[in-house]
Amino acid sequence: MTSYRDLTATPGEAQVIVDTALLAAAPAELEIGKVYAFRTPAGVEKVDLTGDQYKDAPTRKTGTTTVRDTASFLAYFGKHADADSEVYADAERFTVTAVLDANTAGAARWGGHRAVLALRQTDAWKQWAASDGKLMTQEQFAEFLEDHLPELLEPDAATMLEIAQSIQGVAKAEFQSGTRLNSGERKLAYVETVTAKAGQKGELVIPETFVVGLVPFEGGEGFRLTARLRYRINGGPLQLGYKLERPADVLRTAFQGVVTEISEGITVPVLNGTSV
Protein backbone atom coordinates (compact mmCIF):
# COMPACT_ATOMS: atom_id res chain seq x y z
CA MET A 1 0.00 0.00 0.00
CA THR A 2 1.23 3.46 -0.84
CA SER A 3 1.94 5.70 2.22
CA TYR A 4 1.34 9.45 2.15
CA ARG A 5 3.35 12.10 3.99
CA ASP A 6 1.39 14.84 5.90
CA LEU A 7 3.03 18.23 5.15
CA THR A 8 0.61 20.23 7.31
CA ALA A 9 2.54 22.07 10.06
CA THR A 10 1.51 21.52 13.64
CA PRO A 11 0.57 24.60 15.74
CA GLY A 12 3.99 24.57 17.36
CA GLU A 13 5.75 24.39 14.05
CA ALA A 14 3.60 27.23 12.68
CA GLN A 15 4.58 29.50 15.57
CA VAL A 16 8.24 28.74 14.95
CA ILE A 17 7.77 29.77 11.34
CA VAL A 18 6.11 33.04 12.41
CA ASP A 19 8.80 33.83 14.98
CA THR A 20 11.52 33.11 12.44
CA ALA A 21 9.87 35.39 9.92
CA LEU A 22 9.58 38.20 12.46
CA LEU A 23 13.24 37.92 13.37
CA ALA A 24 14.23 37.92 9.73
CA ALA A 25 12.15 40.98 8.90
CA ALA A 26 14.00 44.24 8.34
CA PRO A 27 13.61 46.80 11.15
CA ALA A 28 11.04 49.50 10.46
CA GLU A 29 11.66 53.15 11.30
CA LEU A 30 8.93 54.53 13.55
CA GLU A 31 7.74 58.12 13.45
CA ILE A 32 7.92 60.26 16.58
CA GLY A 33 4.52 61.46 17.75
CA LYS A 34 2.57 58.33 16.84
CA VAL A 35 1.38 55.16 18.60
CA TYR A 36 2.10 51.72 17.12
CA ALA A 37 0.75 48.28 17.94
CA PHE A 38 2.51 45.00 17.07
CA ARG A 39 1.42 41.42 17.39
CA THR A 40 4.08 39.37 19.19
CA PRO A 41 4.23 35.83 20.55
CA ALA A 42 3.27 37.25 23.94
CA GLY A 43 0.37 39.26 22.59
CA VAL A 44 -0.12 42.79 21.27
CA GLU A 45 2.65 45.21 22.21
CA LYS A 46 2.05 48.96 22.07
CA VAL A 47 4.77 51.50 21.37
CA ASP A 48 3.80 55.06 22.32
CA LEU A 49 6.10 57.70 20.85
CA THR A 50 3.94 60.70 21.78
CA GLY A 51 5.70 61.51 25.07
CA ASP A 52 7.75 64.64 25.63
CA GLN A 53 10.88 62.53 26.17
CA TYR A 54 10.94 61.87 22.43
CA LYS A 55 10.67 65.53 21.44
CA ASP A 56 13.15 68.36 21.24
CA ALA A 57 11.05 70.38 23.72
CA PRO A 58 8.03 69.70 25.98
CA THR A 59 4.57 70.16 24.52
CA ARG A 60 3.53 72.57 27.29
CA LYS A 61 4.90 74.25 30.39
CA THR A 62 4.25 72.46 33.69
CA GLY A 63 5.28 72.68 37.32
CA THR A 64 4.84 74.97 40.32
CA THR A 65 7.49 77.54 41.17
CA THR A 66 7.51 78.93 44.73
CA VAL A 67 8.92 82.39 45.37
CA ARG A 68 9.30 84.35 48.60
CA ASP A 69 8.89 88.01 47.67
CA THR A 70 6.70 90.19 45.51
CA ALA A 71 9.45 91.18 43.08
CA SER A 72 10.22 87.54 42.26
CA PHE A 73 6.52 86.76 41.78
CA LEU A 74 6.05 89.68 39.38
CA ALA A 75 9.19 88.74 37.44
CA TYR A 76 8.07 85.13 36.94
CA PHE A 77 4.51 86.14 36.12
CA GLY A 78 5.68 88.71 33.60
CA LYS A 79 7.78 86.10 31.81
CA HIS A 80 5.19 83.31 31.54
CA ALA A 81 1.69 84.81 31.82
CA ASP A 82 -0.76 85.56 29.03
CA ALA A 83 -4.10 87.37 28.82
CA ASP A 84 -5.99 84.39 30.28
CA SER A 85 -3.73 83.74 33.28
CA GLU A 86 -5.44 83.96 36.70
CA VAL A 87 -4.18 85.09 40.11
CA TYR A 88 -5.68 84.10 43.48
CA ALA A 89 -4.94 85.61 46.91
CA ASP A 90 -5.53 83.43 49.98
CA ALA A 91 -5.64 85.64 53.09
CA GLU A 92 -5.79 82.63 55.43
CA ARG A 93 -2.58 81.05 54.18
CA PHE A 94 -0.87 84.29 53.14
CA THR A 95 -0.24 82.96 49.63
CA VAL A 96 -0.76 84.34 46.14
CA THR A 97 -1.10 81.76 43.34
CA ALA A 98 -0.86 82.42 39.62
CA VAL A 99 -2.39 79.83 37.27
CA LEU A 100 -0.42 80.74 34.18
CA ASP A 101 -2.22 78.38 31.79
CA ALA A 102 -5.74 78.83 33.18
CA ASN A 103 -8.85 78.08 31.14
CA THR A 104 -9.84 80.62 28.53
CA ALA A 105 -13.41 81.87 28.12
CA GLY A 106 -14.04 79.41 25.31
CA ALA A 107 -11.63 76.54 25.85
CA ALA A 108 -10.14 74.42 28.58
CA ARG A 109 -6.45 74.45 29.38
CA TRP A 110 -4.36 72.29 31.66
CA GLY A 111 -3.80 74.65 34.60
CA GLY A 112 -0.56 72.84 35.36
CA HIS A 113 1.88 75.74 35.19
CA ARG A 114 1.78 77.84 38.37
CA ALA A 115 3.69 80.34 40.45
CA VAL A 116 3.11 80.63 44.20
CA LEU A 117 4.17 83.49 46.45
CA ALA A 118 4.48 81.87 49.89
CA LEU A 119 5.27 84.62 52.37
CA ARG A 120 7.50 83.83 55.34
CA GLN A 121 7.16 85.59 58.68
CA THR A 122 10.31 87.23 60.01
CA ASP A 123 12.11 85.75 63.00
CA ALA A 124 11.36 88.86 65.06
CA TRP A 125 7.64 88.60 64.35
CA LYS A 126 7.56 84.91 65.22
CA GLN A 127 9.41 85.49 68.50
CA TRP A 128 7.16 88.32 69.64
CA ALA A 129 4.08 86.33 68.62
CA ALA A 130 5.30 83.22 70.46
CA SER A 131 5.61 85.09 73.79
CA ASP A 132 2.47 87.18 73.33
CA GLY A 133 0.22 86.86 76.39
CA LYS A 134 2.61 84.62 78.32
CA LEU A 135 3.94 85.52 81.76
CA MET A 136 7.67 85.12 82.39
CA THR A 137 9.96 85.32 85.36
CA GLN A 138 11.71 88.64 85.94
CA GLU A 139 14.94 87.27 84.51
CA GLN A 140 13.21 85.86 81.44
CA PHE A 141 11.31 89.09 80.74
CA ALA A 142 14.42 91.22 81.18
CA GLU A 143 16.41 88.96 78.86
CA PHE A 144 13.61 89.07 76.29
CA LEU A 145 13.71 92.87 76.26
CA GLU A 146 17.49 92.87 75.94
CA ASP A 147 17.35 90.40 73.04
CA HIS A 148 14.81 92.57 71.20
CA LEU A 149 16.14 96.07 71.74
CA PRO A 150 16.22 96.77 67.94
CA GLU A 151 12.42 96.40 67.79
CA LEU A 152 11.66 98.66 70.78
CA LEU A 153 10.50 102.12 69.65
CA GLU A 154 8.74 103.81 72.59
CA PRO A 155 10.25 104.11 75.12
CA ASP A 156 13.45 103.94 73.12
CA ALA A 157 15.91 101.05 73.31
CA ALA A 158 18.19 102.80 75.82
CA THR A 159 15.31 103.43 78.24
CA MET A 160 14.01 99.89 77.88
CA LEU A 161 17.50 98.53 78.53
CA GLU A 162 17.58 100.46 81.82
CA ILE A 163 14.17 99.04 82.71
CA ALA A 164 15.37 95.51 81.91
CA GLN A 165 18.42 95.99 84.11
CA SER A 166 16.24 97.36 86.93
CA ILE A 167 14.00 94.29 86.70
CA GLN A 168 17.01 92.01 86.90
CA GLY A 169 18.36 93.96 89.88
CA VAL A 170 15.36 93.06 92.05
CA ALA A 171 14.92 89.50 90.88
CA LYS A 172 15.15 88.19 94.46
CA ALA A 173 12.69 90.70 95.94
CA GLU A 174 9.20 89.94 97.19
CA PHE A 175 6.62 92.06 95.37
CA GLN A 176 3.59 93.13 97.34
CA SER A 177 1.47 95.55 95.30
CA GLY A 178 1.11 97.40 92.05
CA THR A 179 -0.50 100.76 91.33
CA ARG A 180 -1.14 102.78 88.20
CA LEU A 181 0.41 106.25 88.05
CA ASN A 182 -1.11 109.29 86.34
CA SER A 183 1.73 109.11 83.83
CA GLY A 184 0.41 105.78 82.63
CA GLU A 185 3.26 103.85 84.22
CA ARG A 186 3.01 101.07 86.78
CA LYS A 187 4.62 101.29 90.21
CA LEU A 188 5.39 97.93 91.79
CA ALA A 189 6.28 97.88 95.49
CA TYR A 190 8.65 95.23 96.79
CA VAL A 191 10.60 94.12 99.84
CA GLU A 192 14.16 92.85 99.52
CA THR A 193 14.72 89.27 100.63
CA VAL A 194 18.46 89.03 100.00
CA THR A 195 20.24 88.68 103.36
CA ALA A 196 22.28 91.88 103.04
CA LYS A 197 19.20 93.96 102.18
CA ALA A 198 16.47 91.94 103.87
CA GLY A 199 13.46 94.05 104.82
CA GLN A 200 14.39 97.04 102.70
CA LYS A 201 11.50 98.38 100.65
CA GLY A 202 11.63 99.73 97.15
CA GLU A 203 9.60 100.56 94.08
CA LEU A 204 9.98 99.52 90.47
CA VAL A 205 8.42 101.81 87.87
CA ILE A 206 7.76 100.34 84.44
CA PRO A 207 5.68 101.54 81.46
CA GLU A 208 2.13 100.25 81.18
CA THR A 209 2.46 100.16 77.39
CA PHE A 210 5.34 100.23 74.97
CA VAL A 211 5.58 100.32 71.20
CA VAL A 212 7.47 97.85 69.04
CA GLY A 213 8.28 98.03 65.34
CA LEU A 214 7.91 94.71 63.53
CA VAL A 215 8.10 93.52 59.93
CA PRO A 216 5.54 90.69 59.61
CA PHE A 217 6.81 89.21 56.32
CA GLU A 218 10.32 88.91 54.94
CA GLY A 219 11.01 91.73 52.51
CA GLY A 220 7.80 93.49 53.49
CA GLU A 221 6.68 96.68 55.19
CA GLY A 222 7.19 97.41 58.90
CA PHE A 223 4.38 98.21 61.36
CA ARG A 224 4.07 99.78 64.80
CA LEU A 225 2.33 97.65 67.44
CA THR A 226 1.37 98.63 70.96
CA ALA A 227 2.20 96.09 73.66
CA ARG A 228 0.41 96.27 77.02
CA LEU A 229 2.36 95.20 80.07
CA ARG A 230 0.97 92.33 82.10
CA TYR A 231 2.15 91.28 85.52
CA ARG A 232 1.18 89.03 88.38
CA ILE A 233 1.99 89.47 92.06
CA ASN A 234 1.34 86.61 94.43
CA GLY A 235 3.20 87.90 97.45
CA GLY A 236 6.42 86.54 96.03
CA PRO A 237 8.33 86.61 92.75
CA LEU A 238 7.01 88.96 90.09
CA GLN A 239 5.83 87.59 86.76
CA LEU A 240 5.85 89.84 83.72
CA GLY A 241 4.64 89.67 80.15
CA TYR A 242 2.95 91.66 77.40
CA LYS A 243 -0.08 91.52 75.15
CA LEU A 244 0.18 92.80 71.59
CA GLU A 245 -2.78 94.82 70.35
CA ARG A 246 -4.54 93.13 67.42
CA PRO A 247 -1.54 91.40 65.79
CA ALA A 248 -3.88 89.43 63.49
CA ASP A 249 -5.11 92.71 61.99
CA VAL A 250 -1.52 93.74 61.34
CA LEU A 251 -0.86 90.48 59.50
CA ARG A 252 -3.95 90.96 57.35
CA THR A 253 -2.99 94.55 56.58
CA ALA A 254 0.54 93.48 55.67
CA PHE A 255 -0.79 90.76 53.36
CA GLN A 256 -3.25 93.16 51.74
CA GLY A 257 -0.33 95.47 51.02
CA VAL A 258 1.40 92.63 49.18
CA VAL A 259 -1.77 91.89 47.19
CA THR A 260 -2.11 95.57 46.27
CA GLU A 261 1.49 95.71 45.09
CA ILE A 262 0.95 92.65 42.90
CA SER A 263 -2.34 93.99 41.55
CA GLU A 264 -0.62 97.20 40.49
CA GLY A 265 2.10 95.23 38.70
CA ILE A 266 -0.07 92.98 36.51
CA THR A 267 -2.91 93.45 34.03
CA VAL A 268 -5.27 90.71 35.28
CA PRO A 269 -7.42 91.01 38.42
CA VAL A 270 -6.36 89.37 41.69
CA LEU A 271 -9.19 87.09 42.82
CA ASN A 272 -9.92 86.45 46.49
CA GLY A 273 -9.77 82.69 47.08
CA THR A 274 -7.90 79.58 46.00
CA SER A 275 -7.50 77.87 42.65
CA VAL A 276 -8.59 74.30 42.00
Language-model-derived ranges and their functions:
Residues E29, D84-E92, V99-G111, Q121, ...:
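Amphipathic, membrane-inserting segments
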Residues A71-G78, T97, E139-E146, P150, ...:
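Generic detector of well-ordered alpha-helical segments enriched in charged/polar residues
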Residues M1-A102, G265, P269-V276:
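An N-terminally focused, membrane-permeabilizing/fusogenic/translocator signature enriched
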Residues R120-M136:
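Short N-terminal edge-element motif at the start of the domain
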